[in-house]
UniProtKB/Swiss-Prot annotation:
InterPro entries reported in the protein's UniProt record: Snake_toxin-like_sf
Function: The heterotrimer blocks the voltage-dependent L-type calcium channels (Cav1/CACNA1) from the heart, and the small conductance calcium-activated potassium channels (KCa2/KCNN) in the chromaffin cells and in the brain. Is very toxic to mice.
Native source organism of the sequence: Oxyuranus scutellatus scutellatus
Disulfide bonds: C3-C21
Protein name: Taicatoxin, alpha-neurotoxin-like component
Keywords: Calcium channel impairing toxin, Calcium-activated potassium channel impairing toxin, Disulfide bond, Ion channel impairing toxin, Neurotoxin, Potassium channel impairing toxin, Secreted, Toxin, Voltage-gated calcium channel impairing toxin
């Protein structure tokens, strides 16, 4: 599971077909 740092965005939803999560801390 990879996390990318996004500005003012904190979502634990992953797009279909990819295990990518968007978190503000990028930890998880």
């Amino acid at each position: 599971r990879r996390c990318f740092i996004t500005p003012n965005v904190r979502s634990e939803r992953c797009p279909p077909g990819q295990e990518v999560c968007f978190t503000k801390t990028x930890d998880g």
